[in-house]
Design a protein with these regions (language model features):
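C-terminal motif of bacterial Sec signal peptides marking the signal peptidase cleavage site
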Residues: 20-21
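Bacterial N-terminal signal peptides that target proteins for export
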Residues: 1-11
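Noncatalytic scaffold domains of N-terminal-nucleophile
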Residues: 25-42, 46, 54-216, 220-222, ...
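Internal maturation/activation junctions in enzymes
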Residues: 287-388, 397-401, 416-417, 425, ...
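Active-site rim segments in enzyme catalytic domains, especially the processed small/beta chain
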Residues: 67-92, 239-241, 381-449, 479, ...
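Extended C-terminal subregions enriched in glycine
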Residues: 436, 478-529
Length: 563
């Protein structure tokens, strides 16, 4: 049962992941939006249907997710934007959160120098200065074609009229209710015992979005909305000031770009670790011709795990905010360096993470998240990953504004060598400093094949984002899968420390698990979980699109068929 609706005399099909296989074979897709929620995908495709571009649809989709996907969609967080124009120009915008001006390197340590549990993850002191709204206006000023008022109005209507709670969302609300109440009190909006099928109306969010609609960027970063934010952060122990908000600016950055066989891959540069890490992984596996092995075979998993292990080790030492630290990008992606990194790989036994230190290089002078992918009929493409960091961020809910604030400060290294909430270890390169951007794993990525747009891909998943994007691209271009099949396929993950291979539960043959263990791999079945929720679009040689919306969530694709 596809849902069809008509906008501007164009027939549009809204497809849940379980319906994609029913797409008529005689119909070709010319535009698509794939996101974490049906409502957001539908709003995004409606913007394309009325003549907007992928950049217009990006803004509308993002704002819709802020309403109906509050655990990660946001105006109180930040994100990364990767784009490719129809004529092949590629760029990125960094609207990652920043540390407040009052932040300090040891702000989460006790008098003995130990990390205070929960201080960087829960409550006002965990909140970084939000960048989402500034990012959306920056994108609109450079690339938008429709009025901003047109792009924000569907989200205002969605907040005011309400969205329907799904079963997965109801479970999510319930799982965090205790923390919502602890920080915000019993009457807070998302502590109200919602069940699947209930409608959530958020009038406060509608009013906030109207302020942004009417006053532009200043509607969030100054005036009553900003004052409400600062007061709520202060009341819950935080240090963000009005000056922090007024001084926030996004940054256009040069993307990470590397080649793998006949693919040209663009991804986010630091302060994202994603582009460098997948660049390292692809180049480390390239000599092994993964396509000769069956998908998720012992051999393929061995090679990929060992590449993941070594890349995450480098991540821990070298990566941070390029505006504050020098990052040896070229050296980290140098093929000779990466060949040396893989030289210790042994088919007969697992490497030990204790033996795999971050590499020695020559310096040269760069968990809960949501991703969406968009391609328009003109050939423009957008990959966006946006986040509050943990699910519902700091759990600080600005009641008068109707939105959650991030806990992005946890993505700094509170103390070198001590893992964050995702188990990732960092160094002084990612130490806290005033107005510094924290390191991220978000990996929005665009792939070209033989010079033409081929894939738009990304995922949430904290530390597993990088490996999920890596494996999804390989699933298509090495293992011959279609887009939905590649998204559905079981995933695995290794991040150097802890020294464990994480497998999605119930998805891998026990014989394969035993074979890995026999070679010395620690397969941490007790920690197995869903890994990533990939939303992606594949473009074939005739420029027809196919979509992959991850069934691990409530993700959905909305498409426009060719006439």
């Amino acid at each position: 049962m596809k849902t069809f609706f008509s906008v501007s005399n164009i027939t549009i099909s809204l497809l849940g992941t379980f319906l994609l296989s029913c797409t008529p074979t005689d119909k070709k897709i010319e535009a698509a939006v794939v996101s974490a929620r049906e409502e957001a995908s539908k709003i995004g495709i409606s913007i394309l249907a009325r003549g907007g571009t992928a950049y217009d649809a990006m803004i509308a989709t993002d704002l819709a997710l802020a309403v109906c996907y509050p655990n990660a969609g946001n105006i109180g967080g930040g994100g990364f934007f990767v784009y490719r124009t129809a004529d092949g120009q590629v760029g990125t915008l960094d609207y990652r959160e920043k540390a407040p001006a009052g932040a300090s390197e040891n702000m989460y340590l006790d008098d003995a120098g130990n990390v205070i549990e929960g201080k960087s993850t829960l409550g006002g002191q965990a909140v970084g200065v939000p960048g989402t709204v500034a990012g959306l206006f920056e994108i609109h000023s450079k690339m938008g074609t429709l009025p901003f008022e047109t792009l924000i109005q569907p989200a205002i209507d969605l907040a005011r009229n309400g969205y329907v709670v799904t079963e997965k969302q109801a479970r999510s609300f319930t799982s965090k209710r205790e923390e919502f109440v602890l920080i915000n009190g019993e009457q807070t909006l998302y502590a109200q015992n919602y069940k699947a099928g209930d409608t959530v109306k958020n009038e406060a969010m509608a009013r906030t979005l109207e302020q942004i609609r009417d006053r532009g960027k200043a509607g969030f970063y100054s005036g009553p909305v900003a004052q409400q934010l600062v007061e709520k952060v202060a009341a819950t122990g935080g240090i963000i000031t009005l000056e922090d908000l007024e001084n926030y600016k996004p940054v256009w950055r040069t993307p990470i770009n590397f080649k793998y066989k006949n693919l040209n891959i663009y991804s986010m540069a630091p302060p994202s670790s994603g582009g460098i890490c997948i660049g390292q992984m692809f180049q480390m596996v390239a000599p092994y011709d993964l396509g000769q092995y069956p998908h998720n075979s012992l051999e393929a998993i061995q090679v990929m795990v060992e590449a993941e292990r070594r890349s995450y080790a480098d991540r821990s030492k070298f990566l941070g905010d390029p505006d504050f630290v020098s990052i040896p990008v070229d050296s980290l992606l140098d093929s000779r360096y990466l060949d040396r990194r893989m030289a210790s790989f042994d088919w007969e036994k697992a490497s030990l993470s204790s033996d795999i230190a971050p590499g020695s290089i020559v310096w040269e002078e760069s968990e809960e998240t949501t991703h969406y992918s968009i391609v328009d009929r003109f050939g423009n493409a957008v990959a966006v990953t946006t986040t509050l960091n943990g699910s519902y961020g700091s759990k600080v809910f600005v009641e008068e504004g109707g939105y959650f604030l991030n806990n992005e400060m946890d993505d700094f290294s509170s103390k070198p060598g001590v893992p964050n909430m995702f188990g990732l270890v960092g160094s002084a390169a990612n130490a806290i400093a005033p107005q510094k951007r924290m390191l991220s794993s978000m990996t929005p990525t665009i792939v070209e094949k033989d010079g033409q747009l081929a894939m738009v891909v990304g995922t949430p998943g904290g530390s597993t984002i990088i490996t999920s994007v890596f494996q999804t691209i390989l699933n298509v271009f090495e293992f011959g899968m279609g887009m939905q099949e590649a998204v559905d396929a079981p995933r695995f993950h290794h991040q150097w420390l802890p020294d464990s291979v994480i497998l999605e539960p119930g998805k891998f043959d026990p014989a394969l698990i035993k074979a890995l263990q026999d070679k010395g791999y620690n397969v941490a079945e007790q920690y197995s979980r869903i890994i990533g929720r990939v939303d992606a679009i594949l473009v074939d040689d005739q420029k027809n699109l196919s979509t992959g919306a991850d069934p691990r969530g409530d993700d959905a694709a909305a498409v426009i068929y060719k006439e």
